Amino acid sequence: MADRQSLEEALRRIWGYDHFRYPQGEVIDCLLARRDCLVVLPTGGGKSICFQLPALLGEGLTLVVSPLVALMEDQVQSLRRQNLPAACLHSQLSRPERKQVLYQLGQQQLKLLYLSPETLLSEPVWNLLRQPQVKLQGIMLDEAHCLVQWGDSFRPAYRRLGALRRGLGRDKGQIPLAAFTATADRQQQNLIVEGLNLRSPECFQVSPHRPQLHLKVKMVLSEYCRRQQLRRFLLKHLQESGLIYVRTRTMAINLAQWLQERGFDSEAYHGGLGPHQRRQLEQKWLTGQISSVVCTNAFGLGIDKPDTRWVLHYQAPLMLMDYLQEVGRAGRDLQPAECLTLVSEPTGWLDSGDRQLRQYFLSQASKYLQRAEVLSQQIPSQGNLGQLKAHFPDLEMALAWLHRRGNLEWLDPFNYRINPGHYQANPLEELKSQYRLMTQYLTTSRCRWQTILVAFGDNSPAARRPCGTCDNCLVGRC
């Protein structure tokens, strides 16, 4: 295994940095020793170096499982600019491009291959990875919090990743598996470890505290008041880059149109846009052609604009983990940034929008769980996903719910076995618990950063003293 001096020489040669930041060196040592790890590192903490450096120094191919195309392309382009052997594989590639990457994979010409969980588990890619000539060095799961997310953004393939090593066979089954995320509390960390079947992982965690982010929550009495607060906020931040987060596609479209009618250069970004439209809009915002984007949580991962001066939550996220991810888009240049969340008054009598939104997402989650229970009575107790998908709609989602609840075991990424009555968890109750945490944050009179850090089990000095910059601290409540 390489010593720290040779690792720092490689760091200097490839990236131009003289020294590692904690815990980069420790994570790299762990991976080079072929041990599993879980890394919770705030946005901008340099997590990509943790898996890119050992991949480039070691022998064989490192797979990087990533949720979004923009995230993959950004990192691969950066590596290619330095003539490093990296590629990404996703559904938006042309047929010749895809063929070229598969050829490079088969010929062992790559050190890093970025791909989504769905692409990884597709038949041509999986069969190629199982070939004896393809030597694997490790599997890195980026944005690992996706494993514990539910709702519209949930992707069932994540629940099958824990069976990767078992499916790859005896020789390749000994490779290390690492999970990286910017946000995960203790419960979510445990879920990630269990869901991925990490083997006695080393855990590295850095405080999520971002002192340059000034957190504020403002109560509104009606939809009209909410829009007027938004308008006043934007007038205060003219010529500054920022993001307006909403929870639904319809709201993104309607709110962007309302802003355009009032002269603001804002556009809507959501999951319904095609790949070309998404890239075009991302570039317009990154290059300053527009100052703000009204977006759902489809926007953000892999988009790095250091001078983002504000984030406004027109509708609050339902989970504290999502909130921390989204405000983390601001202030990456370490300069002060304002993060404002607009919320309905607590009773919901005058403006029931927030309450209805929570009820809607809980209702959707409940429907998924009910569907899973019905399907579990209809499908064979043991079976192959590919053979059964055509006969059972929503099979993948149902199997993911059953796996999360402890009723199902993946024998490999394609074959399952149901364990009836073997309940380990109630996903719906866990979701309600996460919603309550978010509500506590929005209604607290304590320091907002302290509230977040306590919720995430952070023991740093920042968790023991008021931040001095949030709205509660500024009015003397802390």
From Swiss-Prot:
Domain of life assignment: Bacteria
Keyword Methyltransferase in record: no
Domain Helicase ATP-binding: 28-202
Substrates-to-products reaction catalysed: Couples ATP hydrolysis with the unwinding of duplex DNA by translocating in the 3'-5' direction; ATP + H2O = ADP + phosphate + H(+)
A molecular function (GO) term: ATP binding
Family matches, as Pfam families: DEAD, Helicase_C, RecQ_Zn_bind
Motif DEAH box mapped to chain: 142-145
Main EC class the enzyme belongs to: isomerase
A biological-process GO annotation: DNA recombination
SMART domains per UniProt: DEXDc, HELICc
Domain Helicase C-terminal, residue spans: 229-380
Record text on cofactor binding: Requires Mg(2+) for helicase activity.
Binding site for Zn(2+): C447, C467, C470, C473
Note: Cyanobacteria do not encode always the HRDC found in most bacterial RecQ proteins.
NCBIfam families in UniProt: recQ_fam (TIGR00614)
Function: An ATP-dependent DNA helicase which unwinds DNA in a 3'-5' direction.
PANTHER family for the chain: ATP-DEPENDENT DNA HELICASE Q1, DNA HELICASE RECQ FAMILY MEMBER
Protein name per Swiss-Prot or TrEMBL: ATP-dependent DNA helicase RecQ
Organism whose genome encodes this protein: Synechocystis sp. (strain ATCC 27184 / PCC 6803 / Kazusa)
